């Protein structure tokens, strides 16, 4: 009864406000104490709804004017319901731009992607389904473009559950965002649901799907899509064909790529420079510079080679150790009006550094500076690595400092090069500092990084420094996790210091860290190859009890690390198999290797 009286009172207030607005006496609305909170969200929503019915006053203009005016009051703020109602009214009267802008503001302020919120918005109004679908489609686009893929999918699922159909553009944007994030499995799931809802795919949707095939390296699926397109009367365009050609070229399937080009030309679609660049990139990547150059010369008169064409060829010649031809092509590139960018310079710089031509590399850097071409991470990492290889750590550190001063951030490759360089010159304190900095920045050192440090300590007969390294991790508040112990133990075992590896292993277990298959198998093999079969068997027992298995990756890694131990390895793996610590599929792999 109380709720009914309250609803009746709100309805009377809403009618009174509507009458006041229609008479143009806006100041009298304040008598209803709008700004004091007496005018509830439900009343505002009702007023907006009723005012929209007076089409003689210009469609939604009265509703919109009231919405804006109410929003301008000092203590007034529109609720989610009143804002949503206004968006639907604007959409109904095809004021799409204003509705879209209001929806964007609402999406920034409210958690619209919550299923509970979405259900309340749909359930709270009896609107034209097409209007609701329109607004939800905009919301899908908003979240997808903002990189909030999961939110966009939630809205899509809400549209489905309401029996509505999303707009084609919204589906295209969502699919495209999923492809960019490499979520190809989700792409196909959304596409199937979209088709079931009655959304008819056009050339743009199919191009997104072909692009998804490109991302996942699946030319067979792309070919099926082309067949499906032709069956449905959707004709492939230049983007479709170029994407498929690119997939084949990346997989070195050049005959198939040429077949696609032939089909493309027979269907009346002329190749463009992107088509040629795909072929040139494919051949250059494989070092087939003769074919790449032939294609370059065959570029038709109505197609012009671009910056990418020349850069791809220059990179190809650098990879094939023909720096002179790469430099000649750079001159041709400049004479044709194309300015080499940082990618072009990086290719040449990499080759000069590989050849130890550091002076020429520095001259190239000076040239880049003169042309206002800013070095990127690849430029700096190439130089740091080159200096570290020739043990010029002073110059490597200078490049590092310039890199930081220019606003670039050190990445995993920068740190690894510096750590390796400092370990080579036995400046292990500096190597440790780079290691700690690397971890603090969120990068995970791998086996190679820890190996360099272990080798450095052993070369200086400072085995105890490894234990101190673990202690320093704790002092700095860093996590001495299983990955750290794994890297150290693996390298120490490789150096045939299995007794010290055992010390680290016991230290790890005392801290509550549980060893994995890599640690146990590595130590077991270290014992095995030194004739300590009993100790190895004890580790196998623990592995069996903990259900730790040798996988294919571990099998290949240990076999590669100890490639010279053929007979020892064969007996070791046979024993591992007898202990049921290796799967049948890996045993078959071992047998095939032995046959070969």
Curated annotation (Swiss-Prot):
Write down the InterPro entries for this protein, in alphabetical order.
Answer: Mito_RNA_Proc_CCM1, Pentatricopeptide_rpt, TPR-like_helical_dom_sf
Q: Name one Pfam family in it.
A: PPR
Q: Which UniProt keywords apply?
A: Repeat
Q: Where are the PPR repeats?
A: 132-166, 167-201, 202-236, 237-271, 272-302, 306-340, 341-375, 376-410, 411-445, 446-480, 481-515, 516-550
Query: Does Repeat count among this protein's keywords?
Result: yes
Q: List the disulfide bonds.
A: none
- Keyword field contains Lipoprotein: no
User: PANTHER family under this entry?
Assistant: MITOCHONDRIAL GROUP I INTRON SPLICING FACTOR CCM1-RELATED, PENTATRICOPEPTIDE REPEAT-CONTAINING PROTEIN PET309, MITOCHONDRIAL
Q: Which family does it belong to?
A: Belongs to the PPR family. P subfamily.
What name has this protein been given in UniProt? Answer: Pentatricopeptide repeat-containing protein At5g38730
Native source organism of the sequence: Arabidopsis thaliana
């Amino acid at each position: 009864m109380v709720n009914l009286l309250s609803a009746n009172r709100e309805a009377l207030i809403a009618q009174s406000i509507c009458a006041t607005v229609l008479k143009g006496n806006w100041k009298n609305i304040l008598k209803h104490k709008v700004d004091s909170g007496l005018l509830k969200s439900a009343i505002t929503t009702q007023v907006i709804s009723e005012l929209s019915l007076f089409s003689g006053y210009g469609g939604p203009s009265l509703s919109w004017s009231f919405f804006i005016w109410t929003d301008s009051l000092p203590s007034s703020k529109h609720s989610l319901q009143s804002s949503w109602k206004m968006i639907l009214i604007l959409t109904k009267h095809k004021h799409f731009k204003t509705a879209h802008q209001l929806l964007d503001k609402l999406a920034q302020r409210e958690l619209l992607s919550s299923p509970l919120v979405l259900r309340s918005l749909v359930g709270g109004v009896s609107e034209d389904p097409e209007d609701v679908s329109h607004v939800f489609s905009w919301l899908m686009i908003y979240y997808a473009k903002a990189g909030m893929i999961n939110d966009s999918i939630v809205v899509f699922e809400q549209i489905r559950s309401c029996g509505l159909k999303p707009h084609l553009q919204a589906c295209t944007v969502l699919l495209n965002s999923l492809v960019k994030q490499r979520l190809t499995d989700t792409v196909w799931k959304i596409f199937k649901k979209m088709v079931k809802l009655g959304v008819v795919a056009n050339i743009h949707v199919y191009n997104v799907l072909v692009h998804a095939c490109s991302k996942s390296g699946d030319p067979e699926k792309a070919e099926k899509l082309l067949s499906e397109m032709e069956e449905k009367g959707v004709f492939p365009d230049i983007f479709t064909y170029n994407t498929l050609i690119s997939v084949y070229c990346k997989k070195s399937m050049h005959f198939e790529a040429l077949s696609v080009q032939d089909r493309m030309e027979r269907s009346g679609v002329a190749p463009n420079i992107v088509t040629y660049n795909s072929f040139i990139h494919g051949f250059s990547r494989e070092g087939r510079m003769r074919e790449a150059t032939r294609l370059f010369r065959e570029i038709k008169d109505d197609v012009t080679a671009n910056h990418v064409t020349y850069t791809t060829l220059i990179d190809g010649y650098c990879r094939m150790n023909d720096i002179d031809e790469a430099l000649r092509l750079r001159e041709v590139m400049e004479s044709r009006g194309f300015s080499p960018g940082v990618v072009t310079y990086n290719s040449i710089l990499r080759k000069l550094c590989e050849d130890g031509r550091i002076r020429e590399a520095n001259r190239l850097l000076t040239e880049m500076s003169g042309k206002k071409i800013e070095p990127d991470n690849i430029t700096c990492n190439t130089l740091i690595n080159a200096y570290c290889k020739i043990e010029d750590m002073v110059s490597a550190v200078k490049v590092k400092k310039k890199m930081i001063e220019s606003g670039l951030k050190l990445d995993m490759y920068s740190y690894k090069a510096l750590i390796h360089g400092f370990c080579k010159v036995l400046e292990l304190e500096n190597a440790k500092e780079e290691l700690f900095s690397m971890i603090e920045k969120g990068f995970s050192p791998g086996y190679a990084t820890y190996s360099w440090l272990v080798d450095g300590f052993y070369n200086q007969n400072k085995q105890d420094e490894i234990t101190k390294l673990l202690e320093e991790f704790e002092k700095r508040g860093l996590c001495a996790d299983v990955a750290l112990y794994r890297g150290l133990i693996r390298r120490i075992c490789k150096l045939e210091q299995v007794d010290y590896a055992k010390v680290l292993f016991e230290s790890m277990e005392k801290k509550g860290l549980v060893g994995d298959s890599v640690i146990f198998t590595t130590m077991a093999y270290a014992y095995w190859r030194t004739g300590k079969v009993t100790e190895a068997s004890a580790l196998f027992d623990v592995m069996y009890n903990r259900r730790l298995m040798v996988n294919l990756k571990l099998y290949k890694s240990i076999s590669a690390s100890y490639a010279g131990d053929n007979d020892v390895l064969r007996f070791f793996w046979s024993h591992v198999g007898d202990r049921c610590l290796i799967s049948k599929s890996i045993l078959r792999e071992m047998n095939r290797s032995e046959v070969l």
